[in-house]
Amino acid sequence: MENKNTFSWVKEQMTRSISVSIMIYVITQTSISNAYPIFAQQGYENPREATGRIVCANCHLASKPVDIEVPQAVLPDTVFEAVLRIPYDMQLKQVLANGKKGGLNVGAVLILPEGFELAPPDRISPELKEKIGNLSFQSYRPDKKNILVIGPVPGKKYSEIVFPILSPDPATKKDAYFLKYPIYVGGNRGRGQIYPDGSKSNNTVYNATSTGIVKKILRKEKGGYEISIVDASDGRQVIDTIPPGPELLVSEGESIKLDQPLTSNPNVGGFGQGDAEIVLQDPLRVQGLLFFFASVILAQVFLVLKKKQFEKVQLYEMNF
């Protein structure tokens, strides 16, 4: 009876341990897979520095263009679309984390004026939902609803990203005004070259950390290389580790200098930022403008009618 209880206890403990292990694995994998779009969120309170530079450029070193399109003016409490285009050659392949080649992903950050935010689902029209597709946007911070991030998402499908935006109503939001506002955007295609902790990814150039002669190049079992460099002056040996992905440019016996590239640059992507302006238009001002135009048109019509009437009178007097 005691052995049976012991067996049951051991079985229960093993089941609990396995369950905990599975939970830890799932949580770990989820955080790793989701880490990319929130790298900036984890390290920076605001994605736009005082200089105007968006912090994503700290990891994506290459510069590439982006294009942002928004309406010239919008009315209060109105849903409109901000369209971000991230152009690149769809035939390009990037180096993945495991060293293999794959398609490029894209990501973006949209910095809206205070009061502007992501439109709620019940305010988005079916036509706009079709343009958005399966994209899922999130706020940069819970208290920064005007800053939106997206990505990584497949570049072939989402090189054009449509953000559904809701404009504020100054009648209900005291910090909103009928003014012209700037909108800032940053977009990247492909993986970054530097991680937030400052370490290099495998999507960049690796340089020699010492001057000397390449004594040995060891190809690692899981990919990548270990390059042994011996300094001819003092015999000191340095080992530079190259992750899988970049292609070697040096060979054994070759003399190299400090900071000389050991690999090619595999990066085919890059980051770009842009800006646009939008006017939060006062409906009363629009109505006043329409009334003015209508008044001008009516005045012109009456003027034409009066002129024709005058011409008829003149013609009558001449005939008389």
UniProtKB/Swiss-Prot annotation:
The 4 large subunits of the cytochrome b6-f complex are cytochrome b6, subunit IV (17 kDa polypeptide, petD), cytochrome f and the Rieske protein, while the 4 small subunits are PetG, PetL, PetM and PetN. The complex functions as a dimer. The keyword Magnesium does not apply. Its cofactor is heme. Keywords: Chloroplast, Electron transport, Heme, Iron, Membrane, Metal-binding, Photosynthesis, Plastid, Signal, Thylakoid, Transmembrane, Transmembrane helix, Transport. It is a single-pass membrane protein. It holds the Pfam family Apocytochr_F_C. Belongs to the cytochrome f family. The chain crosses the membrane at residues 286-306. Residues 1-35 form the signal peptide. GO terms for biological process: photosynthesis. Component of the cytochrome b6-f complex, which mediates electron transfer between photosystem II (PSII) and photosystem I (PSI), cyclic electron flow around PSI, and state transitions. It comes from the Eukaryota. The keyword Coiled coil does not apply. One of its GO terms (cellular component) is chloroplast thylakoid membrane. GO terms for molecular function: electron transfer activity; heme binding; iron ion binding. Heme binds at residues 36, 56, 59-60. This is Cytochrome f. InterPro entries: Cyt-f_TM, Cyt_f, Cyt_f_lg_dom, Cyt_f_lg_dom_sf, Rudment_hybrid_motif. It comes from Lolium perenne. Binds 1 heme group covalently. It is found in: Plastid, Chloroplast thylakoid membrane.
